[in-house]
Amino acid sequence: MGDVMYYPINLKIDDMKVVIVGGGKIAYRKCTNFLAFSKKVVIISKDFIDEFENIKDEVEIIENDYDEKYIKDAFVVVAATNNKNVNHEIGIYCRQHGKLVNVVDDSSLSNFAVPSFVKRGDLLLSISTGGKSPSLSAKIRQDLEKIYDEDYEEYVNLLGEARQKIIRDVEDVNERKIKLNS
């Protein structure tokens, strides 16, 4: 058996608690990404880079060292400290307690990876190289951002409205299928 592949899945986490342990650049990037999908993001660290000031009203900030009490009720945990031992401890705890965990400096402890993505309203395009080339993922994301610009948010909304109208108004299953696929 070769490399373990990640299963592509979209999770609805808007009401789920996401805890990020760490206050540096990686933690900040992870935090801003999760804020696009969850309203319950908690950051734990004694020290924070200045950028966290920009999002302090959108997240819960706990200025303290890591303690497992902070992640007991979390659905998703990101271990992004500058201490490999602490990240390892978080990863082990989460794996033993059935939590989704991403350990930024040890993928063997992670049970999920956050792909690069383009989000245009409900259109979500994910890009992953399985961790082999984050720079290629970033390049592909940049290319897709040019192709799928901000107008796609409205386009997807219009398609969704048309789909609902067809489902509501067209009783014949075969005719509905033809209209939905055209």
Give the ranges of each region predicted by the language model.
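Glycine-rich, highly charged phosphate/nucleotide-binding loops
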Residues: K56-K72
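Short basic, glycine-rich beta-strand/loop surfaces that mediate nucleic-acid
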Residues: F75-T81, P115-G131
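ADP-ribose/adenylate-binding Rossmann-like module
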Residues: V76-A80, N87-A113
